[in-house]
Design a protein with these regions (language model features):
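Structural signature of nuclease core domains in nucleic-acid processing machines
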Residues: 1-319
Length: 319
């Protein structure tokens, strides 16, 4: 019988109703007018007047799963989807503000990792929504090895260069309290798996995409894109253990592509993970740092890391 591994709480998603993310004060939260010293001017968040909490997060995910990003009339497409989902989820909110916020998020560039593409450019044939997976851990029902989360940290510490966004997080995974053995099956679903053709390599690239509705600003401040600048969303990725979630999602996508693509090459085809903190995404004019817009977290795994992690989850650490 399938089961989730012990320690599955590490993969919790959005905070509960009324709970704020912890990253709003990273680097000084009081100055919401600019992107920091020498940074771009912040924009008001299109999501500022919309509610928080898990119910709203579920609504956003349900809408994004059903919207045709490539529809000729995006506003009409969004309006129809939002109307149906508001009726289903029975939520009372500003319908026009929600449609506008979704539209601006879909129009926001995804940064250099995705060659600046927007979700708006994604055709239905190039997306898989809610890609479900079941990963057996060290043999599943009949364990054939030992595994704990610290072994993942050890692998990352050994393989990631110092400047990699996950390098510091590796130390967190190596902490003693994460040493409890995990076993069974890891089940879940990926919000979106997208495909685009890398024109330089003339090869399809596949990315894991995860939508996050976390509210990172202080309650007394107007929410802006400044609250979703790189250091703020990076801190939230670590606080929520979203980096671990991204790693496991990439293993799931890697195994799926290995099964479905005859000529699959992880180094060539596995693009990485895009975590979209939607409240920081304000359309084409969203302030960017080194080309990556506010609210967008991108990670491209070094060659071989995801394959090695997949093998570790399958075989265990051997100790």
């Amino acid at each position: 019988m399938a089961s989730e591994p012990e320690g599955a709480g590490l993969l919790d998603d959005e905070p509960e109703e009324g709970e704020e993310g912890a990253a709003g004060d990273v680097g000084g939260g009081g100055d919401t007018g600019t992107g920091g010293a020498g940074g771009p001017e912040a924009l008001p968040s299109p999501w500022a007047e919309l509610p928080g909490g898990r119910r709203f997060g579920t609504l956003v995910h349900s809408a994004m799963e059903r919207v045709d990003f490539f529809a000729p009339d995006l506003e009409a497409e969004l309006g129809a989807v939002v109307d149906s989902q508001l009726a289903y989820h029975r939520m009372d909110l500003d319908r026009e503000a929600f449609v506008a916020a979704l539209a601006q998020m879909i129009e926001t560039p995804l940064g250099p990792a995705a060659r600046g593409m927007r979700l708006r450019e994604l055709m239905p044939k190039d997306r898989l929504d809610e890609l479900t997976f079941e990963l057996p851990l060290v043999g599943g029902d009949i364990p054939k090895g030992k595994l704990d989360v610290r072994a993942i940290g050890d692998l990352l510490a050994e393989r990631l260069p110092a400047g990699d966004p996950l390098a510091a997080y590796a130390a967190t995974l190596c902490e003693a309290e994460l040493g409890q053995a995990v076993r069974g099956y890891l089940t879940g679903s990926i919000d979106l798996a997208l495909r685009f053709t890398d024109q330089e390599l003339m090869a399809p690239k596949f990315f894991v995409v995860d939508y996050k509705t976390n509210w990172l600003g202080a309650a007394e401040e107007p929410l802006t894109t400044h609250h979703y600048r790189p250091e703020a969303v990076a801190a939230e990725m670590e606080r929520g253990h979203y980096w671990l979630q991204a790693l496991l999602y990439l293993v799931a996508l890697h195994r799926y592509l290995r099964w479905r693509l005859p000529d699959y090459d992880a180094e060539l085809n596995l693009g990485g993970a895009l975590y979209l903190f939607v409240r920081g995404m304000a359309g084409p004019e969203t302030p960017a740092d080194d080309g990556t817009p506010a609210g967008v977290v991108a990670w491209q795994p070094p060659a071989g890391v995801i394959e090695e992690l997949s093998a570790l989850l399958d075989e265990g650490s051997g100790s």
